[in-house]
A protein has these predicted regions:
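Short, small-residue-enriched loops and turns at beta-alpha junctions
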Residues: 1-5, 28-31, 54-57, 77-87, ...
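C-terminal helical cap(s) of enzyme catalytic domains, especially alpha/beta-barrels
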Residues: 36, 87, 94, 119-121, ...
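Conserved N-terminal beta1-alpha1 strand-loop-helix module at the mouth
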Residues: 1-8, 60-66, 133-150
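Glycine-rich phosphate-binding active-site loops on the catalytic face of alpha/beta enzymes
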Residues: 17-31, 71-82, 121-145
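Hydrophobic, well-structured mid-protein blocks that either form specific transmembrane helices
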Residues: 9-59
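Hydrophobic faces of well-ordered beta-strands that scaffold small-molecule active sites
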Residues: 1, 22-24, 45-51, 71-73, ...
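Active-site rim beta-loop-alpha module in soluble metabolic enzymes
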Residues: 53-58, 62-96
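Catalytic cores of alpha/beta
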Residues: 5-16, 54-66, 100, 104-106, ...
Length: 155
């Protein structure tokens, strides 16, 4: 789910069903984030803020202030299809989010060759659906991801 309202109710459902993380879209009111986060804490889970569309670093500071530790930095499928690449503006925003204290899951057409771009970012996860699903040899691509991650972050 990408929750925009009813944070408490949907968090109870998600964490009650065994989820570890629940995503709240960045356009949600702060009250939705607070209520979802309260349930996440009680249930041993975490909230991720999906950064899609309009958001500010002040928003990110407010989420972090109430205890949110994660955000998803998303390059949309349409943006990627139109030729948008990861650029300095993206990397600067990700670095600023990292400096606030947020861990980032990065998604949007990520390939193993992209990973060095994110070396200075506090990365929690890479969401790499298209790179794997569209590959002729998905296990080989997965291994390339693992190798690059190990080489860059030592994990």
């Amino acid at each position: 789910w990408k929750v925009a309202d009813a944070g408490e109710t949907l968090a109870e459902q998600a964490f009650g069903a065994g989820a570890n993380w629940m995503t709240i879209i960045c356009a949600a009111p702060l009250a939705t984030v607070e209520r979802g986060h309260e349930v996440a804490l009680r249930r041993g889970g975490e909230i991720q803020m999906e950064l899609f569309g309009h958001w500010t670093l002040d928003d990110a500071r407010a989420w972090h202030h109430i205890g949110v530790k994660q955000a998803i930095y998303h390059r949309g499928r349409d943006a990627q299809a139109s030729g948008q690449q990861w650029d300095e503006a993206d990397l600067a925003k990700m670095k600023a989010l990292s400096d606030i204290g947020l861990q980032l899951s990065i998604t949007g057409g990520i390939t193993p060759a992209d990973l060095p771009l994110f070396k200075q970012i506090n990365v929690k996860a890479f969401i790499a659906g298209r790179a794997l699903a569209g590959a002729a040899n998905p296990p080989q691509v997965a291994q390339a991801f693992h190798s690059h991650i190990r080489d860059i972050w030592g994990a």
